Amino acid sequence: MVARVWSLMRFLIKGSVAGGAVYLVYDQELLGPSDKSQAALQKAGEVVPPAMYQFSQYVCQQTGLQIPQLPAPPKIYFPIRDSWNAGIMMVMSALSVAPSKAREYSKEGWEYVKARTK
Amino acid sequence: MSESELGRKWDRCLADAVVKIGTGFGLGIVFSLTFFKRRMWPLAFGSGMGLGMAYSNCQHDFQAPYLLHGKYVKEQEQ
């Protein structure tokens, strides 16, 4: 009797946890249109770091531990779009001048060989 | 489609993919722990579903360049 009640309780607890997770996803429209997902990600980016900081401060106050300040991460600026576009333009200009350059170099090479064999 | 609009669409696609894959993975973890005895397949299933939904959204976004993304503004009662 007790075992049955306990297994029923376990099932209800698991069902409520899973149902709560599904409801949360539905309420926040995380699996909906891309606009809502982008807004949810932005909101998470604004809310999570201060919440984590406050939680760490609360843990420090309660336990008396001092968490050392981590140095700020280095800001890396690498414009992917600009370097990609510059790379594409360089490759295309190299391809466009390749026949004339090849002709020029082969002509120079031929003149050099001719001059050496005289 | 201008380059800035294309850039915005790519940003939206990436953000959407991150959210959907993460949500699918999270739901997979919940169901794996509660009902499926800590098996791995709910995680793979959830992540795969999220990836597929994000891909479908991105495909629709890039193939329909003339749709405007608006938002609902509730009328304020006077």
Curated annotation (Swiss-Prot), chain B:
The keyword Acetylation applies. Keywords: Acetylation, Membrane, Mitochondrion, Mitochondrion inner membrane, Transmembrane, Transmembrane helix. Pfam families: DUF543. The modification N-acetylserine is found at residue 2. Residues 37-78 are mitochondrial intermembrane. The chain crosses the membrane at residues 17-36. Its main location: mitochondrion. The keyword Mitochondrion applies. GO terms for cellular component: MIB complex; MICOS complex; mitochondrial crista junction; mitochondrial inner membrane; mitochondrion; SAM complex. It is a single-pass membrane protein. It is found in: Mitochondrion inner membrane. It comes from the Eukaryota. One of its GO terms (biological process) is inner mitochondrial membrane organization. Belongs to the MICOS complex subunit Mic10 family. Component of the MICOS complex, a large protein complex of the mitochondrial inner membrane that plays crucial roles in the maintenance of crista junctions, inner membrane architecture, and formation of contact sites to the outer membrane. Component of the mitochondrial contact site and cristae organizing system (MICOS) complex, composed of at least MICOS10/MIC10, CHCHD3/MIC19, CHCHD6/MIC25, APOOL/MIC27, IMMT/MIC60, APOO/MIC23/MIC26 and MICOS13/MIC13. This complex was also known under the names MINOS or MitOS complex. The MICOS complex associates with mitochondrial outer membrane proteins SAMM50, MTX1 and MTX2 (together described as components of the mitochondrial outer membrane sorting assembly machinery (SAM) complex) and DNAJC11, mitochondrial inner membrane protein TMEM11 and with HSPA9. PANTHER family: MICOS COMPLEX SUBUNIT MIC10. This is MICOS complex subunit MIC10.
